[in-house]
Amino acid sequence: MKGLRLIATGGALPGRTVTNEELSRTVDTSDEWITTRTGIQTRHYCTEGENAATLAVAAAKQALQRSGLAPADIACCVCATLSAPDATPSVACQVQAALALPENRPALDVNAACSGFLYGTAVARGLLATLGGRYALVIGTEALSRLMDPADRSTCV
């Protein structure tokens, strides 16, 4: 988007790695079938205590550290997710609290599935323009392993 620049990234993965071979023991599929059609060999499932918010906090901490910015520099926090662990507080508000971002700055979630991060970036751009801020924290996080049926081949593969 014109006028925006990415200055740092962060990342976090859930703790459990699930292979195609493991999936083939519970649903009608094979490693070869999955790999040939999707290229996927492993996926990550949340373990106890992990969810979209905990992953967002971990990734955001890493991004903030890499950016060299202080929490006070962040004008807004926008989190793109469709798998928030709770309706309220929003994942963005949980990140805001965990990173000690200023409480008087906007923190909100955007629910737009696969395109969520792009929409979140557009929302952050609008907030920066409106608020006069310089830096936004935009997060994309999902914990779909919490929502899917591990016995349903159409969603677990």
Predicted regions and their residues:
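Conserved "HGTGT" condensation-loop signature of ketosynthase/thiolase-family condensing enzymes
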Residues: 1-75, 97-99
